Amino acid sequence: MTTPRSLADDLRARDDAALQALVRRRPDLALPTPGDLGQLAGRSVTSASTARALDHLTRFGLQVLEAAVVCEEPFTLPQVRALFPDTAQADVDAQFDDLVLLALVWGEPDAWRPTIAARETVGRFPAGLGPTLAVVGGGTPADLVAALDEAPAEVREVVEALTWNNPTGRVRNADRVVTPETAKTPIEWLLAREVLRPLDKGTVVLPREVALHLRGGRLHRTVTTEPPAPDLHHHDPVVVDRLATGTADEVVRHVGTLLERWGVAPPAVLRSGGLGVRELRSAATLLDVDEPIAALVIELTKA
């Protein structure tokens, strides 16, 4: 089997059933009908289409996608599983397969990659993690972990505040030179040992490897594979029937008012057979309702 070099190659290797499943889950990709699989791949990586696909993911689906973004490319499925140590492997695998089906992740078992659009849509700090040491520079993960093991309690409090949420903090002169001997504050202690790294003159960041160590290797504090139970409210059937009757009476009155007015002064009709915006607004004013409600009354009157 040829290794796919792009998402387009990945799609070309899929069978008809897989492509049909992709279009069913992401129907915007088929409107208008793409000329070829290259065009389908191009549409699937647009920001708008990717954001729409993410909107339909479950919370767990988003968490697994964040894991795919966090892993260094190319990555393998076991690397994703490792970020969910307390979650059943079968659940992670099933959700990952769904991301592949949706063309949010592509590749092959030994070399998976999230699409660039998926990475950008997830955001700069996936799962609240900062950039890697390869990006921000600094010591090795082992050196930083060893430094944290010797950190005073007040220093640990600062690091823990950046562990699960926003990995950045605002600090004046964040890029100043500090040594272990000259450090006077918890922030300076961390800067001197490169546990925190400057992003710019006023911002420090906790490197990804440090945060993952403090999280115990977990990407998320809590993981729920099942969708949340809907918040259902009980309504008295008598009250529901009373409201429905009142609404029906109101609709009948609106239809009568519309027929009475249009029987005397028929509205102008477009060449296509519909009503123009001006006529819709006039009907809404006549009925003293919003335009969507006026449009519904007009449709009911026509029917």
Residue ranges and their predicted role:
Residues 1-303:
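Short, amphipathic alpha-helical interface elements at domain boundaries
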